[in-house]
Amino acid sequence: MNVAIFGSTGFVGKYILNSLIKNNHKVYTLVRKESEHKIKHINPINIINGEITNSTSLEQTMMNCSTVIYNIGIIREFKSKGISYKKLHLDYAKHVIDKAKLLNIKHFILMSANGVKDFGTGYQTTKYHAEEHLKKSGLNYTIFRPSLIFGKPKNDQEFCTQLRDTMIKLPIPAPIFFQNLNIFKAGNFKMSPIHVENVADFFVKSIENKTHYSQIYELGGLESFDWKAIIKTISIAVRKNKLTVPAPV
């Protein structure tokens, strides 16, 4: 199959690229010129240089494809640099979805996230509205909502690496979160981390498989951990005795 992917230069995107190639798909990806070096070593792929806001660039990326994967996302905003949840999760996604509809793309696969909802955090809400736009587009779609994704970083910032660098290694207590004034339940919420290779394989196995059309899949690993256990596990791995403090969400 000919597959277009948007969001191929990050942690998860590179794994999806490799899985696509391993399964003999012909891959097209839109990449800004300054980011091309991140995936130039992955072959064979067809790289289109351009901006996602440019209609011609989108058409060049998708015109020969039957499936589109939208994997653009961030877990932290930098609004001073124009990097926001709304722009990357929603505005850009809508732009690609609408173009895919015009090009009669057979199957659209969207990377969403576990716990998305309307009127949630900025991250949750923008992911939710991207899902809703896709569901109303008339395209055959598959939506994946993974839990925390971990794996070998390969010079990228995956979850455990970011947690280590931005929380565990800092000389201040790590926050353990709670909601609705339930301070005694701080850090007790459960998560089921999933390996990045499993996520990539789920994406690729769903391609143009009609049993996966109009489906939303929540992805998680075999085991569940609470936030306190995750903090403790990573702290032990980096040999650091980490204090924690309750923090409201």
PLM feature segments, named:
Residues 2, 66-67, 107:
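Structural motif
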Residues 3-23:
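N-terminal Rossmann NAD(P)H-binding glycine-rich loop of SDR-like oxidoreductase domains
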Residues 25-32:
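Conserved glycine-rich Rossmann-like NAD(P)H-binding loop of the short-chain dehydrogenase/reductase
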Residues 28, 74, 82-153:
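Conserved Rossmann-fold NAD(P)-dependent oxidoreductase catalytic core, especially the SDR/UDP-sugar
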Residues 35-41, 45-103, 114-119:
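NAD(P)H-binding glycine-rich loop region in Rossmannoid oxidoreductase-like domains
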Residues 165-194, 198, 202-206, 210-213, ...:
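A conserved pocket-lining segment of Rossmann-fold NAD(P)-dependent short-chain dehydrogenase/reductase
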Residues 202-249:
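Mid/C-terminal beta-alpha module of Rossmann-like enzyme folds, strongest
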